[in-house]
Amino acid sequence: IFGPLLGSLIAGFMYRSIGENVATILATSIVILGAIISWFVFLDIVAVDSGSVVVFDWIISGSLNSQWAVKVDSLVKVMLVVVLSVSSLVHLYSLGYMRHDHNWNSGEKYKARFFSYLSFFTFAMLVLVSSDNLLQLFFGWEGVGVASYLLIGFYFKKPTANNAAMKAFIAVSYTHLTLPTT
């Protein structure tokens, strides 16, 4: 689950030292590896017990003890396969698409930023579908909203992309109001 976050950090912060192409390939490879592992877990090739896996204690204050935990059940296994498999295909498609992208001037470094956003979106979606408590679900929900805004507005030089990103942000913000009632 934390693999795409690692890929996002590598693509976002290390592309200057390791190169843009290496960063994008690493981010893509991490998501593909996650998809392969999710298929093994889904098909019960790797034995994973149902329940919750506590990653770390998050908030401890008096009688309040909130843990960052990953829920493991049949639904989560299915959603891990869906999210990681689709994200792998999107990453692979983006590798080819970005190779011939004419929306930027030659020499501009932008591909690593896109893959950082895309990997962060994958991570936020994984947090959302595997959350064990409402606080963690909220962070996944908000992460998906932020990542959507960043991805939709990626071509920030185009006014249409900026308008679409703002519309998406407003729509997602409106739907956030309904989260506590569901």
Where are these regions (language model features)?
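Hydrophobic alpha-helical segments of secondary membrane carriers
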Residues: K167-A168
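Divalent metal-coordination and catalytic microenvironments
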Residues: P4, L26, D73, N133, ...
